[in-house]
């Protein structure tokens, strides 16, 4: 069982395009040499120049200086671990918290198999994948913001 979608050769529009010699890439200009030799190096060097320029002009420190004699009241992880930290903080059973964290990638792995019957690539015509993405984004943002608040306000974000 593959996830790769095969073209519908019974579609008359696709058959007409194939008869004219127009496959999936019949438009635009080739990537070699235009993009690879001229545009990509300019973009890469421009990005490096912007980063170096900002580092020279604004050498800001990252965080507070370390003080081994003063421990903060609450130790928080890095920002990208906030949703996971919030799950572990609010779920009373640690095994259940670990299972919830494992269920996120397992659920994301099932989405292509649920959406395999749909032949469209447009996200607005793929309701299951779009719904999973939007709900997952909202839940991740909700958990991430809640992890920065005290435990009594973390699930409601202090709104309710």
Swiss-Prot record:
GO terms for cellular component: chloroplast thylakoid membrane. One of its GO terms (biological process) is photosynthetic electron transport chain. The keyword Transcription regulation does not apply. It is a multi-pass membrane protein. Component of the cytochrome b6-f complex, which mediates electron transfer between photosystem II (PSII) and photosystem I (PSI), cyclic electron flow around PSI, and state transitions. This is Cytochrome b6-f complex subunit 4. InterPro entries: Cyt_b/b6_C, Cyt_b/b6_C_sf, Cyt_b6/f_cplx_suIV, Cytochrome_b_C_euk/bac. GO terms for molecular function: electron transporter, transferring electrons within cytochrome b6/f complex of photosystem II activity; electron transporter, transferring electrons within the cyclic electron transport pathway of photosynthesis activity; oxidoreductase activity. It holds the Pfam family Cytochrom_B_C. The 4 large subunits of the cytochrome b6-f complex are cytochrome b6, subunit IV (17 kDa polypeptide, petD), cytochrome f and the Rieske protein, while the 4 small subunits are petG, petL, petM and petN. The complex functions as a dimer. CDD domains: cytochrome_b_C. The chain crosses the membrane at residues 36-56, 95-115, 131-151. It comes from the Eukaryota.
């Amino acid at each position: 069982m593959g996830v790769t979608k095969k073209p519908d050769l019974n579609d008359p529009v696709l058959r007409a395009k194939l008869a004219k010699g127009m496959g999936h890439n019949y438009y635009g200009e080739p990537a070699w040499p235009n993009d690879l030799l001229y545009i990509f190096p300019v973009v890469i060097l421009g990005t490096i120049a912007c980063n170096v320029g900002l580092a020279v002009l604004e050498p800001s420190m990252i965080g507070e200086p370390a003080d081994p004699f003063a421990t903060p009241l609450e130790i928080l992880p890095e920002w990208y671990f906030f949703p996971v930290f919030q799950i572990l903080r609010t779920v009373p059973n640690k095994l259940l918290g670990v299972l919830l964290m494992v269920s996120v990638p397992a659920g994301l792995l099932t989405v292509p198999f649920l959406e395999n019957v749909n032949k469209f690539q447009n996200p607005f015509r793929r309701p299951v994948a779009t719904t999973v993405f939007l709900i997952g984004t909202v839940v991740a943002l909700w958990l991430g913001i809640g992890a920065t608040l005290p435990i009594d306000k973390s699930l409601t974000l202090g709104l309710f």
